Amino acid sequence: MLNFTGQTRRRNVNLGNRTRNSKKDLLEKAKRERERRAQDKLKEDASKTIQKSIRRHFSNVRLFKNTFTSSQLVHMIPAYGGKLIYYISQYDLQQLLKLSHNFLSSYPNSLGNRQLLSLLKLYQDDALVAETLSDLNMDCPTVDEFLDSLSVYLCRASFLSYSSASKLADVIEAWEVMHSSASISIFSISIGSYEKRPFALQFYCILAERNLLPQLINTNPILWDNMAKTYSHCSKGGQKNIAKLLIPNFNNHIAPSVLRSDNDYVLKFYEKAFIDEVIATTANYVSDEDHVKNLMCYIASSPNQSCKNSVLITLLSNKDFVRRLSWEFFHTKFNASKTEAHPLFSVLAQLIDMHLLISTDRELLDYNSVIPIEELKKFTSTLKDFTFRQYWELPKSERNPMLKEAVPLLSKVYERDSRLHFLSTENNPTYWENSEKQFLNLRFYEELQEYEDLYREHLEEESDEDMEKEIDLDKERPPLKSLLLNKMKKRLKSSLRFRKLEILLELPFFIPFEERVDLFYMFIALDKKRLSLDDDHNLINMFTPWASTGMRKQSAIISRDNVLEDAFNAFNSIGERFKASLDVTFINEFGEEAGIDGGGITKEFLTTVSDEGFKDPKHELFRTNDRYELYPSVVYDATKLKYIWFLGKVVGKCLYEHVLIDVSFADFFLKKLLNYSNGFLSSFSDLGSYDSVLYNNLIKLLNMTTDEIKSLDLTFEIDEPESSAKVVDLIPNGSKTYVTKDNVLLYVTKVTDYKLNKRCFKPVSAFHGGLSVIIAPHWMEMFNSIELQMLISGERDNIDLDDLKSNTEYGGYKEEDQTIVDFWEVLNEFKFEEKLNFLKFVTSVPQAPLQGFKALDPKFGIRNAGTEKYRLPTASTCVNLLKLPDYRNKTILREKLLYAINSGARFDLS
């Protein structure tokens, strides 16, 4: 068809899109319709049921209100009990309870009480609690139902007033509910955060104050936790009652888990009031092992060291109690063969440990001290024998667990005795040494060699070439001794030789000091053999240098004006190669000094470096205490730490080469060097050798009364003028935390920790790091601090002139010459200090070598210096040589020798 434009237009016709339903669609539609009708039917039936129930409910309500008389209503509670809550209002129930009071309170059997308690079980607040309880027939106890209902109520309720809680307590008291074993149920409800549910805590406090507490508490940790919370919030009377309940029950598996928690309320158990209750409860039963075991568990469960210290300090303040414990221990057969801890031993050991910590030397030696010195001696003897027998006679798997406390305590007593000699007296200098012949005569060199090999294997991955790696001071240290001993034990099966090695490493004082010194130098000899530094290799290297397998000599040119700096630059970076022979050339203002090193120049170098590094104030590397003993400066930077590290290596080299140096270190510093495995930690008793004034002031503080401490207005902060902070908090928020009698020991501990541990850690670690490059830690740890000082600088108290005479070499003299005879007579007549000055004059050190004068290298020599009587004796300390003119006159010899040693006249190396 043509339109008016003359074109054909296509026409679109919509015929619809409806399709014919299939059979499947029809069936699906019918199914949906049936399901819809079924749902509608269910809704209709449910609606009818609800309407029927509502009509029945209102009918019952009308029935209760309008049908029954008062005489009939009183039977409602016995008949329906808790069901009434669903049918009548709270107000109507309250009226019903009042109406039924006389009837129910005299109900002839337990039904009335049971039904009343079924109401209590369903309450969610305390609106009707008082009325419900007042209706109970108190002459007809229903304890089980009461406990069940009360437990449910405490879990459901949102509120419980003081008066309602008091009425509940009245029922508990009247019915003697706490005699029932089920009574723990009402204390075993997790009250959660007591800030959110204070009513439950208030209820427990009321019960505690009236001493309505459960009899059995060892079965439920929630109960223990609730008692702890309650104790922290109730009155003194309530606390006293809870203390009586808990104190006999610390010896169970539940108490430690509660006491060691992070909750603040647990700390109340470690305040003086509770500790006094513990003492009062235990004091009359120290002969009863269970009571003492309970005390032991209480101490062991302390949530932190501060709490434990508080317990021990409070116990020590009760002299009578400590004396009873001590008397009981010494009058009871101590069975060391038992496999479990001995309670009396454990408690007494911890008390003695604390006594050693806080007592001055004078207090420790006092016969009237809380632990008299005689008691300490007796206990130490028992402890010493027990510990040795356990180590020597038993493999590790069979040893008593008490060794965990015994070994560190015995070591502390030994350290204190090393200075005070209250055990190792003049009459018994070998007190600590074990005299058993089999033990003394047993040789264990193979075990020592194996331990050394294992130690070196362990160090293989740790190179000391990289100084920055060496000075990684915060690196965690593994317990090396235990690790290596356990490896050895698997192969050696705990032989006697292995046990002696254990004793050497963990209880070295059982081995005579002289033997330990020999073992120390044997360790060095083994190490020199490992590095091919021994004499045999030196001889081979001299004639066949092309075949050398050992370390080569380390050469350096050292200016007399910059000894320490030149030595540091030459030798600090070479690591273990510093153990090799040193080829040192000194230069002074005139040029190179002449001399061939036969050991003398090396000694001169080491002693000169030591003198400058330790004693020259311009370097500010070390400080002195009030006894002029040295320790590393606590003001340092990275460069100073490296120099301190190097000086540690120098001291190690001196020990390695048997070179004594005239340096006295502070005792606390030496103890730190021997405490590597425990992170160099020091305790309060070490503070005296760091700052005696501070130490004595803190001792006075510990002995002050509550009012005296309060008057000082002390807080947990410390002035630190050398720090950028100026004032340092000892604990978080320390500037606002005041020191009291209860926390004074914590304050003392924190001051000690800051002064000795935090401030000294890096410089001590640096010095020890350098020292241990040359001297392995376990070589040093065979000794105590006093013995280590003797290794470094010799034995001051004993100068054996006969030994010196027998180890003297003469040049230009014979032993029978008049001048030599006069010399030894004059030396014998010298005062002790003059003898020390003579030794310093000829050897540079005013002490004798530990192994006697035979250990001097080179040996002491006397050379004829001519016949001019006006000349003074001179010395070359580098070769231990005295140049003595042939005076042939005893008086002149005495005058000249005294003048020389007091003026320090010496020759240099020319």
Swiss-Prot record:
Keywords: Acetylation, Cytoplasm, Nucleus, Transferase, Ubl conjugation pathway. It is an enzyme of class 2 (transferase). Residues 1-25 are annotated as: Disordered. It comes from the Eukaryota. It is found in: Cytoplasm, Cytosol; Nucleus. Its EC number is 2.3.2.26. Gene3D superfamilies: Hect, E3 ligase catalytic domain, Hect, E3 ligase catalytic domains. Disruption phenotype: Cells are viable. The modification N-acetylmethionine is found at M1. It catalyses: S-ubiquitinyl-[E2 ubiquitin-conjugating enzyme]-L-cysteine + [acceptor protein]-L-lysine = [E2 ubiquitin-conjugating enzyme]-L-cysteine + N(6)-ubiquitinyl-[acceptor protein]-L-lysine. GO terms for molecular function: ubiquitin protein ligase activity; ubiquitin-ubiquitin ligase activity. Pfam families: HECT. GO terms for biological process: cellular response to heat; cellular response to stress; cytoplasm protein quality control by the ubiquitin-proteasome system; ERAD pathway; free ubiquitin chain polymerization; protein polyubiquitination; ubiquitin-dependent protein catabolic process. Pathway: Protein modification; protein ubiquitination. The active site is at C878 (glycyl thioester intermediate). The keyword Metal-binding does not apply. Coiled coil: none annotated. Its main location: cytoplasm. Residues 810-910 form the HECT domain. PANTHER family: UBIQUITIN-PROTEIN LIGASE E3C. Belongs to the UBE3C family. Interacts with 19S proteasomes. Non-essential E3 ubiquitin-protein ligase that specifically catalyzes 'Lys-29'- and 'Lys-48'-linked polyubiquitin chains. Accepts ubiquitin from an E2 ubiquitin-conjugating enzyme in the form of a thioester and then directly transfers the ubiquitin to targeted substrates. Associates with the proteasome and promotes elongation of ubiquitin chains on substrates bound to the proteasome. Elongation of ubiquitin chains on substrates bound to the proteasome promotes proteasomal processivity. Also promotes ubiquitin elongation of 26S proteasome subunit RPN10. Present with 3120 molecules/cell in log phase SD medium. This is E3 ubiquitin-protein ligase HUL5. It comes from Saccharomyces cerevisiae (strain ATCC 204508 / S288c) (Baker's yeast).
